[in-house]
Amino acid sequence: MAAAAEGVLATRSDEPARDDAAVETAEEAKEPAEADITELCRDMFSKMATYLTGELTATSEDYKLLENMNKLTSLKYLEMKDIAINISRNLKDLNQKYAGLQPYLDQINVIEEQVAALEQAAYKLDAYSKKLEAKYKKLEKR
């Protein structure tokens, strides 16, 4: 490639020189010195190692965060489980108490029905007594 570049330069120098501003001149491409390449490679590997270390550290931190979140979630679910167990126990107690009160509630319902029937009988008796009173007053006036 260097030989081709030299050939191009030689061809251009044989041409008559122009003062045209659009014409560009080429310079010979030089390979960097061996020490520069070695230093650049070391620098590249050092920066790549720093980059990869950062990426791995970030990934590791993400996994630690997920682990902590999972632990907290697990604790919350354990708390919720305990609460649900307590609620279930309390509901069973309430159901037992309700079952114990059920005969009394049934008696209350029966008494309520009897009171309603007695009230209807009282209204009928009141209406009948008013009719009797009206008849009595009518007979008394005669």
From Swiss-Prot:
Subunit field text: Component of the biogenesis of lysosome-related organelles complex 1 (BLOC-1) composed of BLOC1S1, BLOC1S2, BLOC1S3, BLOC1S4, BLOC1S5, BLOC1S6, DTNBP1/BLOC1S7 and SNAPIN/BLOC1S8. Octamer composed of one copy each BLOC1S1, BLOC1S2, BLOC1S3, BLOC1S4, BLOC1S5, BLOC1S6, DTNBP1/BLOC1S7 and SNAPIN/BLOC1S8. Interacts directly with BLOC1S1, BLOC1S3, BLOC1S4, BLOC1S5 and SNAPIN. The BLOC-1 complex associates with the AP-3 protein complex and membrane protein cargos. Component of the BLOC-one-related complex (BORC) which is composed of BLOC1S1, BLOC1S2, BORCS5, BORCS6, BORCS7, BORCS8, KXD1 and SNAPIN.
Tissue: Isoform 1 and isoform 2 are widely expressed. Expressed in various malignant tumor tissues (at protein level).
Residue segments, region Disordered: 1-33
Main location: cytoplasm
GO MF assignments: gamma-tubulin binding
Full protein name: Biogenesis of lysosome-related organelles complex 1 subunit 2
Family as reported in the entry's similarity comment: Belongs to the BLOC1S2 family.
Subcellular compartments: Cytoplasm, Cytoskeleton, Microtubule organizing center, Centrosome; Lysosome membrane
